[in-house]
Amino acid sequence: MRITDVKVTVWEWKDVPPTRYTLRVKTGSRTAQMALVRIITDEGLEGHAFLGSALSALGNDPNLIIERFKPMLVGQDPLARERIWQSISGWAMGGIMRVIGAIDVALWDLAAKAAGVPVHRLMGSFRESVPAYASSAVFESAEEYAQEAVSFKEKGWTAYKIHPPAIPELDIKICEAVRVAVGDDYRIMLDSTWSYDYPNALRVG
């Protein structure tokens, strides 16, 4: 089996819900670009992966796949994922890692289809189920977090992950408010997206 083509289909996601994961991102609804990466083989199998997000533009990513990486992929054995990774990962810098990641995901998808199993089986999964948690956006007040956490708990979610504003004093108040609201028997987590230095990480923790 050999790779014969690589295609990227770009579309617009209109009216993205007003969600944010940092205070620096506007909260109004907007339009985002997404893309589907397709790695096509001579045996009719295709590997698929998504590229892009609701929070960032695609920029030059689709062109990078077609102009830089497609010539490196066509003719390769798609099951030789590690060899392909070694050949393309030298370009891994900045935003290009998004592109390389999409290619890698598409290759895993293709390999799973060739084997007739889900991707997680190829990766050695052994559980039949895993616990799921609810994740917040960024809000401006502790009360909003507390209300949302209670709502998720009542809906049966087993844990709640807080994306705080990344202001240590406020983040501590948010954690305290959520803990009071959901009780001591409910798991909460904090994802500050690399915002703290070491002293503040210890302080908030």
Q: Which role fits each region the language model picked out?
A:
Residues 1-48, 54:
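Structured beta-strand/loop patches that form or line metal/cofactor-binding pockets in enzymes
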Residues 8-11, 42-45, 71-74, 78, ...:
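Generic secondary-structure signature for well-ordered alpha-helical cores
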Residues 31-32, 60, 64, 79, ...:
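Conserved active-site and cofactor/substrate-binding residues in soluble primary-metabolism enzymes
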Residues 40, 104-139:
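Glycine-rich, aromatic-flanked loop segments that form ligand/cofactor-binding clefts
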Residues 40-114:
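Metal- or metallocofactor-binding catalytic centers and their adjacent structured scaffolds
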Residues 81, 119-122, 163:
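Flexible, glycine/charged-enriched surface loops at secondary-structure junctions
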Residues 128-205:
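Metal-dependent enolase-superfamily TIM-barrel catalytic cores that perform enediolate-based chemistry
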